[in-house]
Design a protein with these regions (language model features):
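Amphipathic alpha-helical "stalk" segments
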Residues: 2-279
């Protein structure tokens, strides 16, 4: 591989004074660092393959090549710092097997015509979302990026078996698990409004929660202008399915306090909740 700029190219840049020598050296070092990271990732993957062969667990060549392709996709969408923190990006056969089994369970329920509001569908969707939260390290920005990667990379479906239909089924079943709880707190009119509008802006939540996490990490004051803007965005999104009546909102708050399930698969941590309550 070419290690950045050639000496002739460097001389040409200096002669034309396009870049200073320190700038050229910085560019060279950045290029070499990127190449070293690429080589290091390939080395790690080859070590995993060698260990599998040494233990007598000869991997299927096609599966291994698919894994390499999947890792290349992660490299395109995540920085090195993000990859180091993202469990999904790690070479972990146990995790991969757990996701294959979850995916097969969903396929079985779908093939049998199991409705999304059935107990088994809601339980499976909850397990899926809890695992997803765990394997994104509880960071909603990773979830947002994974969703974008899944939509933009056709190979993702081939590599993981997670089709748009599966995602839609899980999303609906998980929502039904929340709606079933709220039905115990809301009257018929309130529940009808929530059910009608719950899915309207569902896809906006991960990006907003990611912004809340970022605000907490960066120490943004809840009462600052940017903190207040985030709080207003959260309230607007919440009221899009909860409505604006104070008595109804109080019922939602009571449910959130008394029903731990409502916090599952939300990527909302105690720290983020505390920050939001102060805003």
């Amino acid at each position: 591989a070419q290690a950045g700029l050639t000496l002739a190219t460097i001389k040409d840049y200096l002669d034309r004074q396009t870049l200073s020598l320190p700038e050229l050296l910085t560019q060279q070092i950045d290029t070499l660092n990127a190449q070293l990271r690429d080589v290091g990732r390939l080395r790690d993957r080859l070590l995993v393959l060698r260990e599998a062969l040494a233990s007598g667990n000869e991997p299927d060549l096609e599966s291994w090549l698919q894994t390499l392709e999947l890792m290349k996709m992660y490299d395109r969408w995540f920085s090195q710092q993000e990859l180091a923190a993202l469990p999904f990006a790690a070479q972990d056969e146990q995790r991969a097997q757990a996701w294959r089994e979850l995916t097969e369970e969903v396929q079985t329920l779908m093939a049998s015509g199991c409705p999304t509001d059935s107990p088994q569908a809601m339980r499976l969707a909850t397990r899926w979302m809890e695992r997803l939260e765990q394997d994104t390290a509880g960071r909603p920005e990773f979830l947002t990026c994974l969703n974008e990667m899944h939509a933009a990379e056709p190979q993702m479906v081939e590599q993981t078996g997670v089709t748009p239909a599966i995602i839609a089924y899980i999303t609906e079943a998980f929502a039904e698990s929340k709606l079933a709880i709220w039905a115990r707190y809301l009257d018929e009119e309130e529940m009808a409004f929530t059910r009608q509008h719950y899915f309207d802006r569902l896809q906006e939540w991960p990006a907003l929660v990611a912004k809340l996490h970022q605000a907490c990490r960066e120490g943004v004051a809840p009462d600052s202008a940017s903190g207040q803007a985030l709080a207003r965005a959260w309230l607007e999104l919440f009221q899009s399915y909860a409505g604006t009546r104070p008595q109804t909102l109080q019922k939602f708050r009571r449910a959130m306090e008394q029903e731990p399930h409502l916090m599952k698969g939300t990527w909302m941590t105690p720290a983020v909740l505390s920050w939001l309550q102060q805003a």
